[in-house]
Amino acid sequence: VTTVKASALFFTKPLTITGGGTLNAKSEDFCAIYAWGTDLTIDDCTVNASSAGYGINGDSGESEKLTIRNADVTAEGGQEGAICNFYSLTLEGCTITQPAGAAFDATLNGVALNGELVKSGLTIAKGTSGILQPTISTTAPKGIYTLNGQKLRGTLRDQAKGLYIVSGKK
């Protein structure tokens, strides 16, 4: 969707953009996506929002909530901001990957870096929570343990009669 002198997508009631496809929203000079006093959810799809003015924009930043869930989003807002004028931004199953270090700033009501709203090159990618998969050692550490998992000192002969785990075996 491409427009001149208007928002590519303008709405006044809560909206969810969803589906397996891609939405390309471009406005030559206003907002690519404009959530006027309401909430926006982007769920399990790809959204590319680009404008010389605002990329993805709320109205006042007093109550509008933006939720991005398992989605890929790029946003450009050349003069004002890529994602701005929202009260909150919730990311579920995705994270801001570009520019590095960018995050939602509640004072500026948008995605910012170094105290300024990000205006171009904003990328949010799904499947990157920022937490890596843990690496689990499959070998039990050598030693003598109680059934509660407490490590004991000394040898097995030094312990009182009972059940113990020795080198990972009862």
Predicted regions, residues:
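C-terminal outer-membrane/trafficking sorting elements
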Residues: 128-170
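A composition-driven surface/loop motif
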Residues: 1-127
